[in-house]
Regions:
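NTP-dependent small-molecule kinase module
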Residues: 97-180
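Short, polar/charged, Gly/Pro-enriched helix-capping and turn/loop motifs at alpha-helix termini
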Residues: 36, 44, 87, 171-176
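ATP-dependent small-molecule kinase phosphotransfer cores
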Residues: 1-75, 80-81
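Short loop/turn elements that form and flank the Walker-type P-loop nucleotide-binding site
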Residues: 39-40, 84-85, 136
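Hydrophobic/aromatic beta-strand patches that form the interior of the parallel beta-sheet core
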Residues: 45, 88-90, 141-143
Length: 180
């Protein structure tokens, strides 16, 4: 409902309300789908976890409020809701103009297929700035995915991700690091 604009525009939906929609969705997913695996120590790979919510919502606030929002979101999800805090976050940094061209290709030029966020280039540019800010605030690894106009080949991005994951796994399991 939110991404389709059914409850209001980006500007009309309160940042904390929108964040809570996603937080509750993550909580339900955790409780019903993957909490057992997490508690048993299995490696969980997530796309668009709390970190994505942070980037998309904090841009709606004045920048002077970003640190407070990030602290609030971490407290809500990791402390109050008990969701697991990520051990490693890799932000794939793609220039929004390049991303927009890729989306146009994916959707065959049909603008109606874009969600509320994808349809707004200024918003996407703002989200990238917010993501880079959050990466610094929370200590994420940032991997550039384009040269400013063209995306890097998927194999190159994949290799950069593997380097970061391998380094993280070696730090987490030093006795087993020869097996990675």
């Amino acid at each position: 409902m939110y991404l389709n604009g059914e409850i209001g525009s980006l500007e009309e939906v309160n940042v904390y309300a929108a964040s809570t929609f996603y937080s509750i969705d993550r909580y339900i997913s955790y409780q019903t789908d993957w909490s057992r695996d997490c508690k048993e120590g299995r490696l969980i790979l997530a796309d668009r976890y709390t970190t994505s919510n942070a980037c998309h919502q904090m841009v709606k606030l004045p920048q002077k409020e970003w640190d407070g929002y990030l602290d609030w979101l971490a407290d809500l999800e990791y402390t109050r809701m008990g969701l697991p805090e990520p051990g490693l976050v890799i932000y794939l940094d793609m220039d929004p103009n390049t991303s927009r061209r890729l989306l146009e290709k994916r959707y065959g030029g049909d603008e109606s297929r874009k969600d509320l966020h994808e349809a707004n280039l200024f918003y996407l540019l703002s989200c990238r700035g917010a993501a880079l800010y959050a990466a610094e605030h929370w200590g994420w690894k940032v991997i550039r995915c384009c040269d400013g106009s063209d995306p890097y080949p998927p194999e190159q991005i994949h290799q950069a991700v593997l380097v970061e994951v391998d380094a993280w796994l070696r730090r987490q399991h030093p006795a087993e690091s020869d097996g990675f």
